[in-house]
Amino acid sequence: MLEQQQYHLIREHMQPGDIIAFGGNSLFSRWTKLTTRSAVTHVAIVMQTKMRDEDSNRYFNQVMEATSFRGKRGVMTNRLSERVASYDGDIWWLPLSSASRSIFEQNKRDFFNFMFEQDGKPYDVLQLFGSAVDAIDEH
């Protein structure tokens, strides 16, 4: 059952590997929803939790995603609190199931190595459009 929660109430429960799903309201996001027939326009992966913020001495969550944010485009790591505060659309937290968490824990070194290799890659607009075409293909 989906339940709406404030970010500050759930942030401490997030763990690396959890999925954050976004459903934007921009023109591009609405087009993506139409062509993919999905409420989700892109996803991010929680990479690190409880990383100390040197300015406030508090902890925060980081996510990795392929997006356009703060004038940059591509695969990047962002503070989840900043994404939540500035995102125009819906956001869902999808924690890993117990079985998936167990598999993740057994393979997390390879997972993180793969993810860090993706950081900084450019946004692949052609692949994005190709994905949308695949979604509407009836074959």
Positions of the model-derived regions?
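A structural signal for well-ordered alpha-helical segments within the folded catalytic domains
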Residues: Q15, S38-T41, R109
